[in-house]
């Protein structure tokens, strides 16, 4: 046998051995292979478009595939449950979700968590299965709204007194209930001169908020303030104030922002907005989910913050960044 043949056989054996080892050894897991869906309450909401933009950016930065999922409205609870079940069936590395309803999503999240890690953002659920929960302290957000409303009323009348109301977008949403409780508690303990004459729930539609506010104005001509506890209600209530030219008389604090509510703020139909950071929730939600999927330790609860925005401070760089996020 020639030396050339011996070398060729040895080379072949070496290559075959290397191929066997490569086949036998587990392949490393790369971030590019990881899928982490984000499931929001309402994909049509500007607020949630900001959150999805944050998640999308995290996916790009971290090399993670991020399917952007969600119901068509916050009232579509069953739709979100189905989306969650389908997402889990795809065996992702983790799931990021903002539950539409505190009680209704509890058991579905418990069930999903048996298969994949669940990260919660924005709103809670009746479940202890979240590996981490990133949200505004919504109770504190309600208190901030009460302080802002009292200040606006005092600025207009010289005193923290008068009839006020609160309109909540939909019953049963954890974040909204916490805002409501924080607002009512702050008014009760800090502003005895403010009397809550109406505590109403809508159906998640801005038109309903508009109609409710119009009815409140008609039935309660002495009303001086309203807390509209989310973006949809701020849109509807702000529209009612604008149409009736009552910005000087009835002060409204909304929650969250978009072009319409910022316009109302500039024009005086709204006195203030409590603004969260949904971009951070989306970005850090994906980042946290990836860490959990790798077995890393993460914080159980993360407060993503809230700020009172008024016409006086809306041009400040920090506030401007919250009002004008990059969503593309």
Q: Where are the model-predicted features located?
A:
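A residue-level marker of the well-folded mature domains of exported/periplasmic proteins
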Residues: 4-6, 29-328
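N-terminal export leaders
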Residues: 7-13
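Sec-dependent N-terminal signal peptides
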Residues: 14-19
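C-terminal segment of classical bacterial N-terminal signal peptides
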Residues: 20-29
């Amino acid at each position: 046998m020639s030396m050339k043949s011996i070398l060729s056989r040895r080379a072949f054996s070496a290559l075959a051995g290397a191929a066997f080892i490569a086949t036998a050894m587990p392949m490393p897991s790369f971030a590019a292979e990881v899928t982490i869906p984000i499931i929001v309450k309402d994909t049509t909401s500007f607020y949630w478009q900001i959150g999805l933009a944050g998640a999308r950016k995290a996916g790009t930065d971290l090399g993670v595939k991020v399917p952007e999922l969600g119901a068509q409205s916050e009232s579509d609870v069953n739709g979100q449950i189905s989306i969650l079940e389908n997402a889990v069936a795809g065996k992702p590395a983790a799931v990021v979700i903002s539950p539409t309803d505190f009680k209704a999503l509890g058991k579905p999240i418990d069930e999903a968590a048996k298969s994949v890690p669940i990260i919660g953002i924005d709103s809670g659920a009746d479940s202890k299965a979240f590996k981490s929960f990133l949200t505004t302290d919504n109770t504190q957000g309600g208190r901030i709204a009460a302080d802002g409303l009292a200040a606006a009323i005092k600025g207009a009348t010289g005193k923290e007194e008068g009839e006020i109301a609160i309109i909540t977008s939909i019953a049963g949403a954890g974040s909204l209930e916490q805002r409501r409780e924080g607002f009512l508690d702050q008014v009760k303990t800090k502003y005895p001169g403010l009397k809550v004459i109406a505590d109403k729930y809508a159906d998640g539609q801005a038109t309903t908020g508009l109609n409710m506010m119009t009815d409140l104005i008609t039935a309660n001509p002495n009303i001086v303030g309203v807390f509209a506890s989310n973006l949809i209600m701020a849109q509807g209530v702000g529209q009612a104030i604008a149409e009736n030219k009552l910005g000087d008389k009835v002060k409204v604090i909304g929650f969250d922002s978009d072009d319409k509510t910022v316009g109302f703020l500039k024009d005086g139909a709204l006195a203030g907005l409590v603004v969260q950071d949904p971009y951070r929730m989306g970005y850090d939600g994906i980042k946290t989910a990836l860490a959990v999927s790798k077995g890393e330790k993460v914080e159980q609860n993360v407060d993503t913050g809230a700020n009172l925005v008024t016409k006086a401070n809306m041009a400040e760089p920090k506030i401007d960044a919250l009002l004008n996020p990059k969503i593309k």
